[in-house]
């Protein structure tokens, strides 16, 4: 391929995904693979790497640094699970995308007087669930950091809200807890309220970045 220049980044600021591409390399998890990577850098005269990614990418960046390659790590993950930073590239995009979907599900949940369980991504971190839950006014938010949630309390909340005249109920469930479909069946059986589970999935990893994501990314690039 040809060498990149500044013009290659023109008109990309509002695009989702990555113009560089992304992939996993199982070989790089081994010491031999890491040494091979460092040798390739030296062979091609690469005197520094900028690594954008999450936990796995940071482990790889650390390995390259230990092997003498100048390395800079930029936190890029929707999960917001990188230590020593309050923000990761992609998080706000994922939250905004998820919230738009949640609002649509809430509309139909309200129309049909249902309980909706919406599962969002985040691996073992509950930040997307927390932000989406607060931002959409969910009645309950389930986080892996607080895994000892009481399902009976969820059931009681739904029943009590019905008694107060609230006709629909929104539960945001983090990927780290999961099992949304089976949870919906148990809640419906216990409450008599029609309950549906929606797993948003990979749609959260795409979309045009909102302002906050653009600002943080530009700042990180500087």
Question: Can you say where each PLM-predicted feature lies in the sequence?
Answer:
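Glycine-rich oxoanion-binding loops at beta->alpha junctions
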Residues: 2, 7-51, 89-96, 100
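Conserved small/polar residues in nucleotide/adenosyl-binding loops
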Residues: 1-8, 216-222
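Acidic/polar active-site rim loop that often engages polyanionic ligands
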Residues: 74-87, 110-111
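Accessory alpha-helical/coil subdomains and C-terminal extensions
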Residues: 51-53, 63, 91-194, 198
